[in-house]
Amino acid sequence: MRIEKLLNAALLAGAVSAHTIMTSLVVDGTEYPPGHAVRIPSYNGPITDVTSNSVACNGPPNPTTPSSEIIMVRAGSTIQGKWRHTETDVIDPSHKGPVMAYLKKVDDAINDPGTGDGWFKIWEDGLHDDGTWAVDDLIAANGYQDIPIPPCLADGQYLLRAEIIALHGASQPGGAQLYMECAQIGVVGGSGTANPSTVAFPGAYKADDPGITVNIYWPPLEEYIIPGPDPFTC
């Protein structure tokens, strides 16, 4: 109940500002309760400083609530993260931008803060040829983000970092709004052959990256460079 009360407070606090939170995971057809193995913040505002430690798994000015759970996930499966602005909608449609997912292998998913090296991207979507964005697809899917888990992962505990970057105000440095939550998962059934290159949070993004500081309105974008590394493939 405490997690649900915090989530409701966070959603209500950000309702006017159209912010969003990844509240829960869906694994093998089971939608877990909000905050189950997900570090939910007490406020659903964005992180705008890409050099902040909070860019890893959220945090001040949005203190997160620890979770004592780990959700088991099969390598090679596709899970979902559920995003919510309020209980009934996802994010304001004006918040155009990319949607991504990262993993970090850790010894202790419950207590690892997520900061530092070890992160690798496993999925991304950005600007489409028809001018729509990944966020548009997320809204159309009622906030459910598909996240494919690579089949070649080593078994063990991981942090899963799901992220939206809203670019409606990104024409000036510090205007991009980063929304991210970390979930605690245990991977089983992987082949163990994965050897991905990794990046650090903070560190993977710079304020002047073309995918962070960008005017998405004028001139019309012909290409958008999604921040961070290319997604890892087996």
Swiss-Prot record:
- Give the matching Gene3D superfamilies: 2.70.50.70
Q: Where in the cell is it found?
A: Secreted
Q: Does the keyword Signal apply?
A: yes
Q: Where does O2 bind?
A: H168, Q177
The catalytic activity of this protein is classed by the Enzyme Commission as 1.14.99.56
InterPro entries found in the cross-reference section: AA9, AA9_LPMO
What's the protein called, per UniProt? AA9 family lytic polysaccharide monooxygenase D
The lineage is: Eukaryota, Fungi, Dikarya, Ascomycota, Pezizomycotina
